[in-house]
């Protein structure tokens, strides 16, 4: 498989045919892209606890608006949901890619998500109540890299963290 970034000092994970909605996975990926891994995991845990809504940028038809504190002010959008199933699976995969990075000798507190993407998987059929039904499937790819300039003890605004993650991504490009 060809990648757009150099794979030195990058831990990656590619999950095939996860039983989650592709649309939900795309919106969650947009929310946590270029963030530190620990912060992304905290945000997803808040989504599971229904404290923080996932902002829906692309697939926002008939999506309700949320209260002022439920969507992070960085995103400047009011549409949001709490996609539990997709959040659980993506959180599980983030834990897995963190273990991959630890095996490569990286510091887990300085990891940034430099690439996360969700694509449609193989949509097969399953039997439900004697009838056949379409099965949801999503491919998920995640890459994390260690940012030497990041100090986990310091408090950064979300915009600055996204900028740091994007700079790290651009430095890894071939």
From Swiss-Prot:
Keywords: Ribonucleoprotein, Ribosomal protein, RNA-binding, rRNA-binding
Biological processes annotated in GO: cytoplasmic translation
Top-rank taxon: Archaea
Keyword RNA-binding (UniProt): yes
InterPro entries: Ribosomal_uL22, Ribosomal_uL22_euk/arc, Ribosomal_uL22_sf
A GO molecular-function descriptor: rRNA binding
One of the Pfam families matching this protein, by short name: Ribosomal_L22
GO cellular component: cytosolic large ribosomal subunit
Signal peptide: none
Role description: This protein binds specifically to 23S rRNA. It makes multiple contacts with different domains of the 23S rRNA in the assembled 50S subunit and ribosome.
Known partners and oligomeric status: Part of the 50S ribosomal subunit.
Family stated for the protein in its record: Belongs to the universal ribosomal protein uL22 family.
Annotated protein name in UniProt: Large ribosomal subunit protein uL22
Organism: Nanoarchaeum equitans (strain Kin4-M)
